[in-house]
């Protein structure tokens, strides 16, 4: 789909391959230039995620001229919609409440019990993002399609949205739309709810267009069909043609949800405003590797680009798998001996089936992007120090509290309130026995694994058992004091990050 726009409102496309400073250099410079000309009141800077929005907002607020603007400084919420996600800007001024995962999700599940799937930490944490129905609904909306058309034109919807079929999806959709507008039985008030899809649609239906001096859109190539309509609407009243789409068609990763690389490839030829050429992130090896993939795309659309690497040479290694590939020992040794950072990234959750076993088999500490270490050092130390504690070594007050966190109830004679009563000092096992906090019979149980809480649910118990084996491996491989330098996350999470070493799963893709 190519959107038709009047000549005055055509976006100026600022193009830059990976790591060329599109966001943190060019956007800041352009924003400052526009601020000096128009002031900040009607300059709108949009991105796709809250994380990106917050980073941009922080960077703008740290500009010296912004710090000295008394109007901005007197209002802590000044940038709330002026630097925003596309959804949040579209919601501005709306009178509907946003569908809430804490209150509305449980109520919806009561209305449609088949929404409740096998217990999933991801779905519990954010059903709007991870539940198969909401994924399907959002991706269909992003493509500008009804669910039935989206389903019938997707590569493998049964796998993407399992365990549901099309009939289930259509039924849930009907219940969901009814739910958003029905009365809440608890309050007898009409719910009047909206989700992210509704925010965009309501904005696009509004007959009036916003008054904007300038519009800048970061990572514009990831915009969906309805988002592009919204951006076109926002751009109608800008001054002096100040509409800037900043991005790179070759980095489009949301085609399954409506982003359109073909539209942006053509726009990069017809509406090119600025091309950033100097690479600030990728080594020579990575630059060459990426060019081998994207140069044919440049040629297909009849253009070429300059994209220079950094001065770092770098290396690219081929690892067909993480079991017995040539060069695997080199990777393992490097993780063990260097202080460099390592990022494992993948396309789908299925890739974790080979990444996580590899890390845990080798006793490497790791964390999922944006989260704490998968198994905390405090928990690992409980298993390591417990036998020493039983043999008479003193343990710190903090370590004793950590024991109490993990011990089963029947293995403690008192609950954690004891730590508010006793002195903050080191204690021996015998001292805690004499104080009446632990039973002396525990002295024969040197294996802390035998004493910890065990989940009742079978699936969680299996994960618990794997966790215990992993902790043993860390201790047995003498990796106790190893600092966690390993992270893993999918392609969408890692975009824009810089790490010393990146291990990429190329085996699974999504059309």
Predicted segments with their positions:
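The feature marks helicase ATPase cores and/or their adjacent C-terminal helical subdomains
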Residues: 1-511
């Amino acid at each position: 789909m190519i959107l038709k726009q009047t000549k005055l409102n055509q976006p100026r496309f600022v193009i830059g391959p990976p790591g060329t400073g599109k966001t943190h250099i060019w956007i800041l410079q352009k924003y400052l230039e526009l601020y000096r000309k128009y002031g900040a009141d009607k300059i709108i800077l949009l991105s796709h995620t809250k994380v990106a929005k917050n980073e941009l907002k922080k960077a703008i607020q740290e500009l010296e001229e912004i710090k000295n603007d008394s109007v901005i400084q007197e209002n802590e919420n000044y940038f709330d919609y002026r630097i925003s996600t596309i959804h949040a800007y579209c919601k501005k001024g709306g009178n509907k409440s946003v569908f809430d995962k804490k209150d509305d999700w449980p109520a919806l599940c009561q209305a449609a019990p088949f929404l409740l799937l096998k217990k999933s930490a991801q779905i519990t944490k954010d059903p709007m993002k991870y539940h198969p129905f909401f994924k399907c609904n959002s991706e269909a909306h992003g493509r500008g399609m009804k669910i039935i058309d989206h389903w019938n034109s997707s590569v493998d919807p049964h796998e993407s949205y399992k365990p549901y079929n099309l009939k289930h999806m259509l039924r849930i959709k009907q219940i969901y739309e009814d739910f958003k507008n029905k009365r809440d039985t608890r309050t007898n008030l009409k719910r009047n709810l909206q989700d992210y899809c509704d925010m965009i649609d309501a904005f696009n239906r509004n007959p009036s267009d916003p008054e904007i001096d300038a519009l800048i859109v970061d990572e514009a190539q990831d915009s969906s069909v309805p988002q592009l309509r919204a951006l076109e609407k926002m751009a109608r009243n800008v001054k002096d043609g100040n509409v800037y789409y900043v991005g790179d068609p070759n980095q489009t990763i949301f085609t399954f949800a409506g982003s359109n690389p073909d539209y942006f490839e053509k726009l990069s030829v017809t509406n090119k405003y600025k091309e950033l050429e100097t690479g600030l992130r990728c080594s020579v090896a990575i630059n060459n590797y990426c060019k081998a993939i994207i140069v044919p795309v440049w040629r297909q659309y009849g253009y070429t680009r300059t994209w220079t690497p950094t001065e770092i040479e770098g290396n690219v290694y081929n690892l067909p798998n993480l079991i017995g590939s040539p060069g695997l020992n080199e990777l393992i040794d490097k993780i063990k001996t260097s202080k460099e950072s390592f990022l494992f990234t993948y396309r789908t959750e299925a890739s974790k089936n080979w990444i996580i076993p590899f890390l845990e088999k080798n006793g490497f500490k790791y964390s999922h992007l944006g989260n704490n270490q998968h198994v905390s050092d405090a928990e690992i130390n409980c298993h390591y120090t417990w036998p020493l504690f039983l043999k008479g070594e003193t343990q710190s007050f903090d370590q004793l509290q950590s024991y109490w966190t993990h011990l089963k109830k029947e293995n403690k004679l008192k609950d954690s309130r004891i730590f508010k009563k006793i002195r903050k000092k080191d204690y021996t096992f015998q001292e805690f026995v004499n104080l009446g906090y632990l039973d002396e019979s525990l002295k024969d149980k040197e294996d802390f694994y035998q004493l910890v809480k065990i989940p009742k649910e079978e699936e969680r118990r299996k994960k618990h058992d794997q966790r215990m084996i992993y902790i043993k491996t860390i201790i047995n491989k003498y990796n106790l004091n190893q600092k966690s330098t390993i992270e893993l996350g999918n392609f969408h999470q890692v975009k824009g990050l810089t790490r010393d070493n990146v291990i990429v799963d190329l085996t699974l893709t999504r059309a």
